[in-house]
């Protein structure tokens, strides 16, 4: 069969899907159909009957607006994505949302749409493949050996994150990463020459990539030769494919008119004629399905791999068991028992240390149990304290380590970690100053949306960092993280809460965790075993009154000690004061109503929240009758103790505010 007709099946489904939805992007799928046909039918190792096969090649559509391309590919090659699913493109509760979403249709490796993040996720996947191979493969036993392929457009390359990710990919020699640039010269505003005139091949050569320029994106032989050359080269490869957006559309191809709008019934009819595609909307002939189906070949490839793995298992039974545990995302045996013992030991041996140091101590204790840890920092390891005694850096020539030097690339780091998490086999953690989570925010949002494990260590969490001033002092960042759905945000007050936060982040497989730590030393709080257990509920009574409280002080992180001291003074003056430590508001909010009422009785309306972050967040806990000691402006450059005094974070101010409230 003429392979052009196999590519035309993608074009037909794409224009039909967009037309039926009356919205979407037909241009990119029609332009990249020939490349997709060559890659998916000739090179991609995958099994539609088992989309979770551990050693499958990964495919990422970074230009996610062209989602009908991947939906068409999944449908045609035999995944559980029916023609009715394609007809439901962009409709409520369909498996085919406007941009590809992880967890909806089988075979979607990552959620894409925010441009540049797909290529960055792909870099993470390629890093995970190379690291797993270095950790598990033995001579004659290559059980981890697959490619990561990514399609991307001009928009991805204009986004700054593509520089962060592709620069690092070149440095680390990710030879199993192959990217296709859809060089069609068109974006939403029109022809890109006016705003995107980079010499992209030279740019990628400068990163240390293997670049194959000027490939005709509509010539199957040229595309195939480029892929073969890419697979043979030890460097990551950029294949520059010259394509015509909306290929086949007589009146709209090559222009922005077909980028982000349906072609219209008349133009679709003309396109069918132009392409020689004589079938109705959503009609695919049986012989086309037969040519496209990857079920038989995919099952054979997985069966061959299963044989390889059985031989590996016979030769290296312990490694094989560990590989299975890690790719299944299971924690080691005795994890719960050992982790709880570590936490109990910390409570029994008080230390007044910065919570960033407590975080490093937790890494040291837990890391010995977790070979799946893949740590890192955006060039702040000595400040974030993310390296521990077992940390070994990844290098291009040796990927057997467990620590990535991301360089000053906060956004790139976070989206790469999403790719590592999606690939499987690792628990990634990264780090920067809390202030600079702003650079990475959208990648954390994507982790929350995809429900993937991404642990971020955010240190230097308030005006407490002092002299560096307001450019580096976070104010609104904690609230911003807490307001993100499916984000778990922790701001611990001492080494015990810090270890609990780490334990829960390691156990949390269905979303990201933001662990927020101080630069300055924090006093350890005394607790009973029951109180230690209650930390995991996100908020608990740390210090209680004799009898029913008349005032509740709610605090987090460095301000918990302040609340305790103020409570002691108020108690000495005859007031009944309860102190609630609330390291994780989202976790507290998930507790049952009875527990929340026990901690914050609704009839005790005299409440003060104390946190060196934006004040407004706390009204939901203190009510309009309560008071908040927090930040309402940016900080200043000065020693931390002077700043805490200036902004009202003193025992005296808490006591005076309490007296006013109780008067």
From Swiss-Prot:
Entry's EC annotation: 2.2.1.1
Example GO molecular function: metal ion binding
Reaction(s) catalysed (UniProt annotation): D-sedoheptulose 7-phosphate + D-glyceraldehyde 3-phosphate = aldehydo-D-ribose 5-phosphate + D-xylulose 5-phosphate
UniProt keywords, alphabetically: Calcium, Magnesium, Metal-binding, Thiamine pyrophosphate, Transferase
Binding note for cofactor: Binds 1 Mg(2+) ion per subunit. Can also utilize other divalent metal cations, such as Ca(2+), Mn(2+) and Co(2+). Binds 1 thiamine pyrophosphate per subunit.
Binding of Mg(2+), residues: 154, 184, 186
Binding site for substrate: 25, 259, 356, 383, 460, 468, 519
Sites annotated Important for catalytic activity: 25, 259
Active-site residues, record numbering mapped to chain: 410 (proton donor)
InterPro entries linked: THDP-binding (IPR029061), Transketo_C/PFOR_II (IPR009014), Transketolase-like_C_2 (IPR055152), Transketolase-like_Pyr-bd (IPR005475), Transketolase_bac-like (IPR005478), Transketolase_BS (IPR020826), Transketolase_CS (IPR049557), Transketolase_fam (IPR033247)
Residues given in the record as thiamine diphosphate binding sites: 65, 113-115, 155, 184, 259, 436
GO terms for biological process, alphabetical: pentose-phosphate shunt
Family (UniProt): Belongs to the transketolase family.
Protein name: Transketolase 2
Organism: Vibrio vulnificus (strain CMCP6)
Annotated gene: tkt2
